[in-house]
């Protein structure tokens, strides 16, 4: 009888295993920035500017939300203005009837 001894057979990979990477993801865009243009007519409650922090400050008839979003308090015309030497603000002026 012919006996085959295959007890010590070991196979090796001909390519190294592909490692993982910590890259390959990105966060969703937050859609920040101006939502109303200078001179545009808006209604009360309209969002004027979405921001993180206070890049632009609230002016006349403009409120600031909890996430620093600027919104119109009254119906009127949007105006982007300077506030002092190095700051900006946005105001809403009611339309004269």
UniProtKB/Swiss-Prot annotation:
Residue numbers covered by the propeptide annotation in the UniProt entry: 1-12
Gene Ontology CC terms: cytosolic large ribosomal subunit
Protein known as: Large ribosomal subunit protein bL27
Organism: Streptococcus gordonii (strain Challis / ATCC 35105 / BCRC 15272 / CH1 / DL1 / V288)
Ribonucleoprotein recorded as keyword: yes
Post-translational modification: The N-terminus is cleaved by ribosomal processing cysteine protease Prp.
GO biological process assignments: translation
GO MF terms held by the record: structural constituent of ribosome
Entry superkingdom: Bacteria
Keywords, ordered alphabetically: Ribonucleoprotein, Ribosomal protein
Membership in a protein family: Belongs to the bacterial ribosomal protein bL27 family.
């Amino acid at each position: 009888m012919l006996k085959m001894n295959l007890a010590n057979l070991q196979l090796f990979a001909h390519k190294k295993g592909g490692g993982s990477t910590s890259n390959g993801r990105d966060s969703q865009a937050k859609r920040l920035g101006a939502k109303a243009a200078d001179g545009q007519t808006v209604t009360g409650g309209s969002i004027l500017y979405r921001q993180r922090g206070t890049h632009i400050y609230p002016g006349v008839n403009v409120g600031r939300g909890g996430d620093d979003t600027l919104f119109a308090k009254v119906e009127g015309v949007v105006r982007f203005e300077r506030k002092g030497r190095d700051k900006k603000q946005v105001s809403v002026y009611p339309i004269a009837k």
